């Protein structure tokens, strides 16, 4: 057992040097909670020369030229809790990026799914005595990387994909027992002080996605 809870993904990214930006909420009239972290607005020029070669591994390994790598400095995290569509939303976002942003280079991770009750054993016993047994939470997360100059385009495509979701039936949330018409989707935007270099094979432009099958679009990370 851990003495302390592990940090959240946004907290870990902030500790690694990614500055957090807040955007509009995916649900109209939904109250947003201010982040406890300040946004890093001061950026420094990258000290890496674009014409230099980027070594791979330790000394003595084969060096690849800059043409094999793509620099990224902006990261979007798409996260939802209790999304009924499972991976349908994240697969839709991938297809939207491939079809509508084919002229820019974007990298996208696979969908990460998590589940858990989110309550301590003692609290769970108390809730059981009150005849309220919360079901487990299901969380989906996906990360999209792009360059700062392309961030507005990627941001708009993300919001368009989220807002274009079909209305779903009312259901009982596991947290408070109240009915809500739609599951909120959160988009976090981070900006790095230094560029992150990824091999071009890991970008969406090199990853074919089957647009006819709405549930099985995947990319490599």
From Swiss-Prot:
Q: Which InterPro entries match?
A: Herpes_UL3
Give the protein family. Answer: Belongs to the alphaherpesvirinae HHV-1 UL3 family.
Q: Name one GO cellular component term.
A: host cell nucleus
UniProt entry tagged with the keyword Phosphoprotein: yes
Q: Which UniProt keywords apply?
A: Host nucleus, Phosphoprotein
How is the protein modified post-translationally, according to the record? Phosphorylated.
Cellular compartments annotated: Host nucleus
Q: Which organism is it from?
A: Varicella-zoster virus (strain Dumas)
Does the entry feature the keyword Phosphoprotein, yes or no? yes
- Name listed for the protein in its UniProt record: Nuclear phosphoprotein UL3 homolog
């Amino acid at each position: 057992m851990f003495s302390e809870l592990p940090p959240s993904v946004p907290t870990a990214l902030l500790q690694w040097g990614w500055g957090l930006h807040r955007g509009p909420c995916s649900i109209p009239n939904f109250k947003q909670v201010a982040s406890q972290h300040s946004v890093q607005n001061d950026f420094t020029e990258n000290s890496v020369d674009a014409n230099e070669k980027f070594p791979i591994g330790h000394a003595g390994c084969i060096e690849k030229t800059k043409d094999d790598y793509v620099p990224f400095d902006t990261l979007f995290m798409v996260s939802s809790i209790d999304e009924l569509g499972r991976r349908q939303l994240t697969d839709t976002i991938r297809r939207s990026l491939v079809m509508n942003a084919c002229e820019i280079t974007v990298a996208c991770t696979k969908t990460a799914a998590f589940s858990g009750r989110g309550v301590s054993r003692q609290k769970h016993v108390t809730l059981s005595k009150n005849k309220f047994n919360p079901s487990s939470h299901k969380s989906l997360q996906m990360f999209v990387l792009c360059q700062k100059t392309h961030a507005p385009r990627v941001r708009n495509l993300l919001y368009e994909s989220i807002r274009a979701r079909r209305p779903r039936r009312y259901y009982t949330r596991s947290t408070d027992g109240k009915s809500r018409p739609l599951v909120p989707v959160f988009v976090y935007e981070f900006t790095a002080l230094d560029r992150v270099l990824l091999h071009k094979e890991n970008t969406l432009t090199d990853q074919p996605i089957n647009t006819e099958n709405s549930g099985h679009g995947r990319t490599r990370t």
